[in-house]
């Protein structure tokens, strides 16, 4: 088990132990009650932390994409109806998450919805918060760790700069896990979308994705759709981020957390807290539109800005003169 995966495993045990507390939106960690300065000073301090860092580990989660318009996962937003309107009208679905886990009457309908979901993220342009973040990171030694499966970071950076530890919408896997391989989902998804036309809600039998080895139905290589394949590609993601952290442990690392919610704090947030505490020169910066969680143990090494992530990143970029 890699260094970072071991950290995640430890925090998952913590999550299980305090499950009810987490479900209520809380945390078992003792939080800081340190007063925040004025807004402009918060932005200035964040820009200073970024400027002074030798290296930055970005932890990008769902709130980052939501801030740029990818807010159709859990809410019936305009962006949801734009992409999934036909399914909302016919089935009463209110968000992409609900549709992804719906018990569909046929696999043809299921794949019509999943193809629409995957196509929406695969073809989405780079969202504004990601562009501002990219500008902020220019000239810095950085690495990206993400639980997002929407490929936004992959549209900006090469594979060796990003660890996607929860999967990627560009790939399929075998539902039976008969093989360790994942394979391209982009072209099959495109064909399914073409078959749907303007108003259909079911794909033909021959377009339902299947494993090229055993013929079993495939599903997206993302955690949550079933038996998530934690094979070679998955292990490579943890190896990349573990290697990067170990190579930079003695430097002034800034752990930059963006948009972590309360469903999966064990993948980015809590490991970042633990690493900030453990590394003598490390600092922690979180930007979140809802949650003001800064552990008391790192209150002198950390900062949380509560606000619109898109707005905060733009203001930090401007403060940096970029």
Tell where the protein language model's regions lie, with residue ranges.
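Conserved catalytic alpha/beta core of Sir2/sirtuin-type deacylases, generalized to analogous enzyme cores
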Residues: 1-322
